[in-house]
Amino acid sequence: MKYSASTSTPKSAQPKEEELENSLPTNADYSKIDVSKLSEMMQRYVEVKQQYSHALLLFRVGDFFECFFQDAVTIAQELELVQTTKHAGKEIGRVPMTGVPHHAVEKYATFLVEKGYAVVVCDQVEDSAIAKKENRQVKREITRILTPGTLTDDGMLKARYNNYLAAVVIAKNYWGLAYTDISTGEFLTTQTEGLDQLTQELMRLQPSEVLFPTKAPDIGFMLRPGERSDHLPEYLPHSFCYSLRPQQPFSLGEAKERLLMKFQLASLEGLGCERLPLGVRAAGGLLEYLEETQKENQVPLQRLRSYTLADFLILDHQSRRNLEITQTVRDGSYQGSLLSVVDKTSTAMGGRALRRWLQQPLLSLKGIRARHDTIDELIQNNDLRQDIQRVLRQIYDLERLTGRTGAGTANARDLVFLADSLTKLPELSTFVSQGNSPYLKVLQKIPPILQELGKKIHSNLVESPSQKLKEGGLIRPGINERLDEMRKLAEEDQKWIASLETTERERTGIPNLKVGYNKAFGYYISISKSKANLAPDDYTRKQTLTNEERYITEELKEREVRILTAQDDLNELEYDIFVDLRNEVGEYAEEIRNVSRAVAALDILCGLADVAIYQNYVRPTMVDSRELKIIEGRHPVVEKYLPAGFFVPNTAILGSKNLEKNNSGITPYSAPDLIILTGPNASGKSCYLRQVGLIQLMAQIGSFVPASSAVLGVSDRIFTRVGAVDDLATGQSTFMVEMNETANILNHATEKSLVLLDEIGRGTATFDGISIAWSVAEYLATEILSRTIFATHYHELNELSSILDNVANYQVTVKELPDKIVFLHQVQPGGADKSYGIEAGRLAGLPDSVIARARQVMQQIENHSKIAIGLRKGINKKEEEEIITVEQLDIFSEEFGDSLL
């Protein structure tokens, strides 16, 4: 593996030289040390470290994994461990050292990887006793390279999250992307135009690591989140880890050859990506990285599949965030998200798949209806659904167990869990045998070999095997004749040892004589100091302790050699039998994963059926039109957290006739394309917007929806502009962020899109804001023709409905009482003329004097200002121009100021 041996770091992570000199202990930088003067062990450490200068090196020394020099300083700081020093050679002296117990290395390595570091594990690959006997250093080799995107162990992964490794290739405005989760084997690639779409696709995937080819001198370095390099394009999201890679593996020729060899193909046509050169390059470069990092553990990836962004409903990052699909806007938590409400899956793989469904809703009516059909059948057959879920709860993570098995890293317990799951599949198949819907039919025929594999694993492995593969205790009796014979001989020797204590007590007359064993000294005979004078002449003293003497006899020594040798041979044979079994199971990784995907999908649909029953959801009618008709819709998350019956349902009807243009403008509509939604602050406008967006999204993942009824045309995109935040990282104000997001919507929305806008134009001066809001709404209604709900406090926009036939006014109603207002949360036809902002401030707890003064100022403003916007009814751009007149009394004039005093 070729990595830059340079110790330079990316500029954003590079401390000043004087800071390094003041903060690091003496000899913290190995590059400034004469390596020949280091001890032999330290020379080996530096040799490995120079190969992997970009990574943190954990180096096995006895019962610990230790790191030295700058790595020791880094790890001590990141893990909050005690840093000490270690002697590195007579002329070198002591160098920084930090260590972790060998049995806890996985835990500490996981912490480091989560912080964005690559970790190289260099382990002892032979018995240290052998090296000691031969008076040499124990052999150490790299056994694992851990990076954020290449983890497979359960302890390092979140069960219900995919762990994606992505690779990106960019050519001008075109880009190719490949990604995989090596723990599950999925492997996909795509290629398209538009760098903004690349950013959005990366934000959808949330990869743990992104590979980027470059000619940079810092090849091999991993940029942690927030770190940048001159060789990394600025438009790539800053929130990911980037590994800077050499360009050669990403060349088309080498990438193509690597893919063909990996999947044993003659051409790329079999993968469907022969016309995606950038996607092929990204996929080939990703494969090369896996070959380098996984060493001998070749990852059993599924065949590369290509996809296009147009296959799915597109949600940009801001829309996913605003709709709170997988996490809340406020604190990024899972609770309070849509996922927290609809995830009733029983398996980890079902949980991961549901997350993917929510990120990529379907566009295919056939695909959507197939999911609805399955949920319908599961709701109608309650016993069937409960039987399926009972079996699902007994199925482990087939995808990841299969991944570790195919990669050769699964332990015996993994195989037992895999067998437990495989032997449950026939029962699942029996339950769905009478099913009529697509997702039930697919599991009616499960390959018989999978059950046979499960039975074979159970018949070969003991019920509760050790997780340590080279210490025996794995294979059942009767599996291997030679193993049984060796065990019989070993048992006879153990019986002899067990009887030795009784025999020697009788022979010596020492009643408290004991026979013991430890790893350092082997077997021994123990006699207390007070009885040591009774030890027979054939006893040879082996060790003296405070209260006892330990002896050995020639016969015991011979038995010890035989027992230990036999045990080593036994353990080795058991390990070999286990590896053969694991390899055999690994050959069927593709078949197991195909079934696991079907199981995960059925798991999701059973859970969605449960949600539909308990939350009173209905099946939406999906149509091939622009219609959106939600009767008494409810916000799926808000209603869940309110007492039963407290949520006020609301109807939304948009675009129920296909649009037809003629020379005079737009034909009349039975339902508008654009709704101007007005109403008080805190009355529920934003909730209504999100509610409509979530119902559309839920329908397109195949879920039932919270409403009395729903008729929905398929949306190609859902855009949301809800809430206001600045972006300090890029120096953008709240208003500039709002304008950028609005521009993105206007440039990408189509007549099949659903657009949900809240408070466009509020971040600037009032009349600038009104002008922008009016123009945006008008453009959406006349040029894009998307289905839009436009929430605003600019009541002037209500005039649009009198000008454009496909615009309607709706308001969130309130009830005015003498001393307060009551929010009714009902959306009804008509435009509001008040925002009740002062009342909202009173409810929030503003001081009474502030409220009183605000009312006084508002009265004066209403008496002295006037805004009038008029448009000629009907729009014909070629013949007429819009006329907008704004008359405004300067509220900062001396006359107006005096009136407030």
From Swiss-Prot:
Task: Please give the PANTHER family that the UniProt record associates with this protein.
Answer: DNA MISMATCH REPAIR PROTEIN MSH1, MITOCHONDRIAL, DNA MISMATCH REPAIR PROTEIN MUTS FAMILY MEMBER
Per the record, the similarity remark reads: Belongs to the DNA mismatch repair MutS family.
> Could you tell me where the Polar residues compositional bias lies?
1-12
Question: Does the keyword Nucleotide-binding belong to this entry?
Answer: yes
Q: What does this protein do?
A: This protein is involved in the repair of mismatches in DNA. It is possible that it carries out the mismatch recognition step. This protein has a weak ATPase activity.
Positions in coiled-coil regions: none
Task: State the taxonomy lineage.
Answer: Bacteria, Bacillati, Cyanobacteriota, Cyanophyceae, Oscillatoriophycideae
GO MF terms here are: ATP binding; ATP-dependent DNA damage sensor activity; damaged DNA binding; mismatched DNA binding
Q: Which GO terms describe its biological process?
A: mismatch repair
Under InterPro entries, the record lists: DNA_mismatch_repair_MutS (IPR005748), DNA_mismatch_repair_MutS-lik_N (IPR007695), DNA_mismatch_repair_MutS/MSH (IPR017261), DNA_mismatch_repair_MutS_C (IPR000432), DNA_mismatch_repair_MutS_clamp (IPR007861), DNA_mismatch_repair_MutS_core (IPR007696), DNA_mismatch_repair_MutS_N (IPR016151), DNA_mismatch_repair_MutS_sf (IPR036187)
Q: Which domain of life is it from?
A: Bacteria
**Is DNA damage found in the keyword set?**
yes
Report the SS bond pairs. none
Gene responsible for this protein:
mutS
Q: Which UniProt keywords apply?
A: ATP-binding, DNA damage, DNA repair, DNA-binding, Nucleotide-binding
Q: Where is this region: Disordered?
A: 1-25
Gene Ontology terms: cellular component: cytosol
Among the Pfam families in the record, one is MutS_IV
This chain belongs to which protein, by name?
Answer: DNA mismatch repair protein MutS
Residues at which ATP binds: G679, P680, N681, A682, S683, G684, K685, S686
